[in-house]
Amino acid sequence: MPGSTKSVGKFIVLDSETGYGEIIFSEEFKQQYPELEHFRVFKNKKKRELEFKIIDPEENFLANASKVVRLHGGATWALNQIVGGSPLVKALREVFSDYHKDRRLLALAYYLVINGDSALANYEEFAEATFLPYIRGRSSGAISRLLRSIKKDHLSKFLNALQKETQKAYGTMLTERRYWALDSTSITSYSENISSVECGHNKDLIEAPQTNVLLVVDQTTGEPVYFRNFDGNTPDVSTVRNTLAELAIMQIDYSNVVLVTDRGYSSSQNWEDMMRNGMSFVSNARRNLNSAITELINEHYAQLLDWNNYLDFIEQSAVTVPIAWRYDEFPVEGLRRQKQTKKTLYVHLYYNHSINEEDGRRLRTALFKAIGQYKADPAKLTDAQRVLFKNYADEATDGTPTINMQKADQKLRYSGVRVLVSDVITDAQECHIAYENRVQVEHAFRTLKTRLACDRTNVHSTEAWEGKLFLQMLATSISQMVRMRIKSYNEEVQKSGRKLGYRLHYDSDRKLLAKLNNIYLLKCPSGWVFDEISGHKKDLFRIIGVPVPTVGKTMVEDKEDDQEIDISDDTSMDIALDDLENL
């Protein structure tokens, strides 16, 4: 058929100098020409002649037998069922489809999720014994090249594709109000080649060279929807503006999103930036943010103590105060602020009686011990007791120590008080629940730093760190998917009144997957079959909502090929039908 260009397989170069290599025919083409099953076909790339070698049946049998392997498969099979068809995997395929990067990244992410080990140097041994989406390119050098190939442009395209795929998957569900939790964490690094590493105080107030990671998590799914890396000496409060700018550049739709932030991001500048950019918010306002916050608490303090304002569902008293907030919608640097734009903010005041009572009990107990020690032997007072005695105790005219109740009451006045500010949430209970659910971003960070052992970068260049961070976020998303399935199962069990199925800890997904990873399968060229699965291990599959595996057929796309990320296109070229005219 002269002129035909239909692809029939791949050409694998065996000798780069002469261009001599072997043609690996596709399954579809071999179905058209079954006789090719009995031949190996070779060709000189520069010539049109084909060389056919008959396959020895005994040699072929031994070759196929050597391809039968026993692998760990339960955990990765379960992960395939969970992520398969998800917006995450579709976005991964859209952006990283070349040279099977999507499946290579997925296989590496599975390693992180199952092992909880961020040291990718151990991946090669794991890949040799585990059923994975992709099994080639597992050496340290190949992994390093893969990570360095991931640029900021890829990350932006991926996050954009993820939002689009999420929109397709959930459709009208996304028209409802969604809550995204924003927070950041510091990751230690002693590399001098990562540009974002700077000396700063981490979350434990320890000064060390570090890089910061900001994360935005969907509070419903627990999955990251946005992340970025920034300099280690940048304070939390100054990161919101850049985050909003990047979301706008990436054209991420947040019209129905409420951004939930903790006290580290509480500032009038951040509130105004979010209002200017159309990002609704719930912000935990520090009492020392400005005098107006303290004045509002004092003005409504009696209402907070009033039992009529107690909300049983959240077990706190709550009072909502609408205030008029004036700001510049289009500020001009260097010009005096006009504050001509007006918007209503809802300041929700909360009073937790239990916290106040517990703080009072601790202060009272500590003071009585300090006074007792003072009476027995003042010289033996500890430094902490001396401070307590100085701040909250007086001496009577006869030298007897007494508690100064006015000072003690002032100390406890704001104990148990929380202030949340929102531009859209008018109900105090709804606002409180939204803020409490920001625990999902804390779970994500615990997953990232503790569960996936990413408390250090473990790479030595900016290029590798960008790729490594993306891989860690991919693993965090998958881990959160598993975690949310366990959580949903437990909630259903509790509603039914049955015994709790699986205790949910921050690392519960790792423990469950570790048990599933001990389930083996036998893999051969035509497919795979699992060992018999019974009892408790069947229950584990049910907990995460996936069917118990049995047997399956190996798909064409799952088989090994010889494409590598650093191999030029002419190393693995399509063979056209017109090359076979002389057959």
Model-derived features: positions:
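Short, surface-exposed basic-aromatic patches at helix termini and helix-loop junctions that form
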Residues: I252, W271-S280
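Short, glycine/acidic-rich hinge or "gate" loops at secondary-structure transitions
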Residues: R138-S140, V257, I486-L500
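Basic, amphipathic alpha-helical segments enriched in Lys/Arg and hydrophobic/aromatic residues
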Residues: S461-V482
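Dynamic "connector" segments at or just before major functional cores
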Residues: P2-N193, L215-N233, K411, Y520-L583
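Short amphipathic alpha-helical "interface-anchor" segments enriched in bulky aromatics
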Residues: E430-N458
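Acidic, metal-coordinating catalytic cores used for nucleic-acid/nucleotide bond scission
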Residues: P235, L259-Q269, R287-N290, E463-E466
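An anionic, glycine-rich sequence signature occurring as long contiguous blocks
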Residues: N229, S280-A434, D509-L583
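Electropositive, glycine- and tryptophan-enriched low-complexity nucleic-acid-binding patches
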Residues: I206-I249
